[in-house]
Amino acid sequence: MVAQTITLGDTEVKRLGMGSNRLEHTPQNIEFVRAAVAAGLTHIDTAYLYTSGESEQTVGSALDLPRDGLVVATKGGYREGEGKPDVLRAQIDESLRRLQTDVIDLYYLHRVHPDTPLEDSMAVIAEARDAGKIRHVGISEVDVGQIERARAVVPIAAVQNLYNLAQRDHDDVIDHCTQQGIVFVPYFPLRGKDAPAVAEIARRRGRTASQIVLAWLLHRSPAVLPIPGTLSLDHLRDNLATVEIELEQAELDALGAR
């Protein structure tokens, strides 16, 4: 039986969230985010970088309401030089302003940069956490060693890496997160949905290809929380319904074959 919820930080959320890297600041998108939350969405993932800040602005404008039971995550420090303490500190404050909140539920270091020691970047995020600006901390696109270096500075609630049916380079990271009680958030989770095995299982079950690859991810580990991006309420509802799908072992074997 696939678990339908997961504890992210200190909040129980559904095991399907929503990415927002294409979310522009328009009235239509503000209403879409509100409708998505009303439809049952409990986790929204955004970033300082996305749509030049408009994604964070849209989420902030949409969520001028009680946020109990909802986890909003954002990220900073993506481009070269942005992991430096002064830059990252300013990005955290700007994200707070855009999101129209006093505290960010989950804040990721978006990338580890060779020009700034990982520990220095994480220390800034830890400082913001201690100041009450951030509740929980994450890190993105990292290996197991980098996770442990980050954890030596501040507790890590989530790791966000590229992982999907077609790209499985981070199997060891998923296993490590599962063992350590860290949520693993795969981005671009829908890649691989064009595989013949996916089409066959989707046809037989009367489901969409997207639902099948998301279900495969949910079966991969109880620590997995995918964040497919969408601007469609119908697609969002389909994604949220994925937790109802119980794949059989033969189907998992067919999907897992490379």
Annotate each PLM feature:
Residues L96-P114:
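Active-site groove signature of glycoside hydrolases
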Residues M1-L70:
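N-terminal binding-site loop/beta-alpha segment at the start of enzyme catalytic domains
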Residues A35, A39, R98-L99, G132, ...:
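Structural motif
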Residues L16-P27, G76-D86, H110:
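Active-site mouth loops of central-metabolism enzymes
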Residues D68-E80, Y107, E141:
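A short, structured active-site edge motif that brings together acidic residues
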Residues H25-A36, G83-L99, D143-E148:
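Short, acidic/polar
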Residues V112-R258:
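Beta/alpha (TIM)-barrel catalytic core signal, keyed to glycine-rich beta->alpha loops juxtaposed to Asp/Glu
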